[in-house]
């Protein structure tokens, strides 16, 4: 799994404007290899807002195919970069470990297995 983040520095008080743009179903949800999307607002920033859009993909090629698709062009072509976006940075992460919650019984079994 690959995670792609797009972190945007936003003029103070305008972070919600960018967040709202992602609060609807878009074309990315129909792309092969797309696993999910989260939009994060960084807390306690003093001089600016910071919004990070996190997308999860099966592979980096799946993400690249999205950026080369007509769906991507359609989703981005009619939009100029809003004045409130000061800068942004895209980062790629390869997921190496994924852990989920355990029930109490599972946690007990896991502890016993590790002790052996």
From Swiss-Prot:
Its main location: cytoplasm. Keywords: Cytoplasm, Heme, Iron, Metal-binding, Monooxygenase, Oxidoreductase. GO terms for biological process: heme catabolic process; iron import into cell. Heme binds at residue 76. GO terms for cellular component: cytoplasm. It is found in: Cytoplasm. The keyword Oxidoreductase applies. Homodimer. Belongs to the antibiotic biosynthesis monooxygenase family. Heme-degrading monooxygenase IsdG subfamily. This is Heme-degrading monooxygenase. It comes from Halalkalibacterium halodurans (strain ATCC BAA-125 / DSM 18197 / FERM 7344 / JCM 9153 / C-125) (Bacillus halodurans).
